[in-house]
């Protein structure tokens, strides 16, 4: 896949570019300041989603709305004029990042500007699910205070060693904590479910590796929604949704899908293909090889594992695709001890170590995700 240029934080600050006489020193200072305040966009985006502003603009069907019109459906204890002024400031900020589009016109004898807003290019992925997934639950989840707290302890994780920053601060491994914090766990489940809809929808369009598969085992498949999407297209296929007992207890009744409880570190049900979707980056190398070895034992001759995950570039650069990959890698560093994104060479080495000698076939899916087929 070709590298995609970054729309902002790209080395040429949009703010700096609009000011006459900006020299190189100015430009670098602008860029450093943008990095300092990068959290702003995530937090303001979360607020806009929670307030329903982006959904309201989407529902308007292209009609430009004023802040006064938008706050009519926002429950607030403040007066509407005050709320409208706050909404205006939120949306004009988001318009700087192509989330919404802003237009203005003079109104009244004093020439006061009235701004109107419509959806911007990025709203496509940040409004309510239209059947092909949305990132809005993820945008709310990732900056939730309970999820964000460990990020204040990255330096401590480096100097002290031992557990990840998340486990150090929250006192439990990531998934165990999600089970104990039901509020955050629900946000996490919703975020992952919608992310999976996006990914699997694109995978079914672009990936042909399920052709001929009769029995597909989805390891860590959650409630089975991914398998349900796959088996709805591949009617001949039987899907085995494999996850921990408390997860399988919430399994969805889906045609062609059988729910099986177990532990992927112990064994994996037999099938002619095994799917590992967005799991491998959460594993250290020893865990990854252990699970791949269990997959190898569950497969017939010429069976395959399908890993759906990102691929880390050999070297970092400023492209959007590289930044995305290294962003996920640093997220794994904060959340899980030893977990990481991997280069294609690292995938190949670990697959061979687990007994897969048939090589790797790579297919690009969508937003930096690939399907990697390891053949036995």
UniProtKB/Swiss-Prot annotation:
SUPFAM superfamilies assigned: S-adenosyl-L-methionine-dependent methyltransferases (SSF53335), Winged helix' DNA-binding domain (SSF46785)
Keyword Lyase carried by entry: no
Recorded effect of pH on activity: Optimum pH is 9.
GO biological process: biosynthetic process; methylation; response to jasmonic acid; response to temperature stimulus
InterPro entries named among the record's database cross-references: COMT-like, O_MeTrfase_dom, Plant_O-MeTrfase_dimerisation, SAM-dependent_MTases_sf, WH-like_DNA-bd_sf, WH_DNA-bd_sf
Free-text tissue specificity from the UniProt record: More present in the fifth leaf than in the second leaf (at protein level).
Pathway participation: Alkaloid biosynthesis
Binding sites annotated in the UniProt record for S-adenosyl-L-homocysteine: 220, 243, 263-264
GO MF assignments: 3-aminomethylindole N-methyltransferase activity; O-methyltransferase activity; protein dimerization activity; S-adenosylmethionine-dependent methyltransferase activity
Keywords from the named record: Methyltransferase, S-adenosyl-L-methionine, Transferase
Coiled coil: none
Catalytic activity: 3-(aminomethyl)indole + 2 S-adenosyl-L-methionine = gramine + 2 S-adenosyl-L-homocysteine + 2 H(+)
This enzyme's EC code(s): 2.1.1.340
Pfam name, any one: Dimerisation
General function of this protein: Methylates 3-aminomethylindole (AMI) and N-methyl-3-aminomethylindole (MAMI), two substrates involved in gramine biosynthesis, a toxic indole alkaloid. Can use S-adenosyl-L-methionine (AdoMet) as a methyl donor. Unable to mediate caffeic acid O-methylation.
Family: Belongs to the class I-like SAM-binding methyltransferase superfamily. Cation-independent O-methyltransferase family.
Protein name (database record): 3-aminomethylindole N-methyltransferase
UniProt organism field: Hordeum vulgare subsp. vulgare
Phylogenetic classification of the source organism: Eukaryota, Viridiplantae, Streptophyta, Embryophyta, Tracheophyta
